[in-house]
Swiss-Prot record:
Protein name, entry field: N-succinylarginine dihydrolase
Signal peptide: none
Superkingdom of origin: Bacteria
Residue positions binding substrate: 19-28, 110, 137-138, 213, 251, 364
Gene3D superfamilies: Succinylarginine dihydrolase
InterPro entries assigned to the protein according to its UniProt record, in alphabetical order: AstB_sf, SuccinylArg_d-Hdrlase_AstB
Pathway: Amino-acid degradation; L-arginine degradation via AST pathway; L-glutamate and succinate from L-arginine: step 2/5
GO BP annotations, alphabetical order: arginine catabolic process to glutamate; arginine catabolic process to succinate
Length: 446
């Protein structure tokens, strides 16, 4: 059946700030307490969506979550009117207010793991929201994520939106940032590839400096839940040493699309066994795996982390060639820029490189791949998606004007204590749900 890959990008929320909440994420820690520009952040992400839509790619948008999360702050014991809750948290536990105010849901690669209908036992598209239990500011996202996905993919005959896995370290799940899918054509059955950082119940190497956020057990549970074929499901462990170098998700060191895996030579434990397993599984489906392995001598792991070379989008153009979408930081690193020039000039599947300014997101450790959730949809499934979430000229203009109307152009950590920020955000989100036709999505609307 004819199918295409759609990308659903997260719209950056009004509370975008740099609180340094993500240990193991080098960029996040490096920019802690600096001033952010929520308006610029949202516009940078929106421009990427529009330009990719203009190139012919299916591009949707996911709305921000309500922040600050008054639910979290009240669960932590702060009481009174909303303004009182924020004031008390700012005075007594500013780190908790920062966690409750994070706009990290913008990185929708962590929103969920998605399996297309061609791979699942019941022939539906399956979504499992990630529990993100390794970080407080992200662990509060999954219920709102489930609600949003259920609103957009509402046809239960075609879509299955699950609850997140239990939020325990043994089942730590970071979503599609540690998952990709290989296939000959998007509508054909494929091989689903899960990458984990550690196993709870198996002995094996683990990082020693930064935590491994994804477990083997979580990846396996998602695959079982989605009804994937065992022979078309491959698990691999990410190299502990690259996690310790700041590769907190696999999409910082590898990206895949259709029959192509683009990765660093140090990405995986026992890499040849990984390549062999993928090759055999994909070969059984009549396709051939292309591995583009970047050697350390060309691009070091440090350069990869600093530029986010692999946190790129790998997209198939109408002519069958592949387009690599990278952040502008890749052109600011001489080694990475030279590698990209050679890559595009070569005879491999990647012939086109597009550069985007995503500076505001990048300063928090999120490149092009972090900002999007990939969903393969056939024609009937696409027709069942809520129509107002697809980016085109009209929606782009509406969202651009909405950002201008509601977003601040400067936000410091101290500004999170401003009770007006909550009201500004709620007013903005209330209007956004009308633009996107999603109904009463947020707690404050119910």
């Amino acid at each position: 059946m004819n199918a295409k890959e759609a990308n659903f990008d997260g719209l950056v929320g009004p509370t975008h700030n740099y609180a340094g909440l993500s240990f193991g994420n080098v960029a996040s820690l490096s920019n802690e307490k600096s001033d952010a520009n929520p308006k610029a952040a949202a516009k940078q992400g929106l421009r990427k969506m529009k330009q990719l839509a203009d190139l012919g790619f299916a591009q949707g948008v996911l709305p921000p979550q309500e922040r600050p999360s008054l639910r979290l702050l009240r669960e932590l014991g702060f009481s009174g009117k909303d303004a009182d809750v924020i004031a008390k948290a700012a005075k007594q536990a500013p780190e908790m207010l920062a966690a409750a105010s994070s706009a990290s849901a913008m990185w929708t690669a962590n929103a969920a793991t998605v399996s297309p209908s061609a791979d699942t036992s019941d022939g539906r598209v399956h979504f499992t929201p990630a529990n993100l239990c390794s970080k407080l500011h992200r662990a509060i996202e999954h219920e709102s994520t489930r609600r949003t996905l259920a609103a957009i993919f509402a046809d239960e005959a075609r879509f299955a939106v699950h609850d997140a896995l239990p939020g325990t370290p043994a089942l730590g799940d970071e979503g599609a940032a540690n998952h990709t899918r290989f296939c000959s054509e998007y509508g054909a059955p494929g091989v689903e590839f899960f990458v984990y950082g550690r196993a709870e119940y198996r002995r094996g190497p683990e990082p020693t400096r930064f935590p491994a956020r994804q477990t083997f057990e979580a990846s396996r549970a998602v695959a079982q839940r989605h009804g994937l074929r065992e022979e078309a499901t491959i698990y691999a462990q990410q190299s502990p040493d690259v996690i310790d170098a700041g590769v907190f998700h696999n999409d910082v060191i590898a990206v895949g699309n259709r029959d192509t895996l683009f990765c660093h030579e140090r990405a995986f434990v026992d890499k040849q066994a990984v390549y062999d397993a993928l090759t055999a599984s994909l070969g059984a489906l009549g396709a051939r795996l292309n591995v583009i392995e970047v050697p350390e001598r060309a691009v070091s792991v440090a350069d990869a982390v600093g530029s986010y070379l692999f946190n790129s989008q790998l997209l198939t153009r109408e002519d069958g060639r592949q387009l690599l979408v990278v952040p502008q930081e890749c052109r600011e690193n001489a080694n990475v820029s030279a590698y990209l020039d050679a890559l595009a000039a070569g005879n491999g599947p990647i012939r086109d490189v597009r550069v985007f300014d995503l500076r505001e997101s990048m300063k928090n450790g999120g490149g092009p791949a972090c900002l999007r959730l990939r969903v393969v949809l056939n024609d009937a499934e696409r027709a069942a998606v809520k129509p107002n979430v697809w980016i085109g000229d009209a929606l782009f203009a509406s969202l651009d004007a909405w950002i201008d109307k509601h977003y601040r152009d400067r936000l410091s950590p101290a500004d999170l204590a401003d009770p007006a920020l909550l009201e500004e955000s709620r007013t903005a989100l209330d209007e956004l749900t009308q633009i996107l036709g999603l109904g009463s999505l947020y707690d404050f609307q119910r």
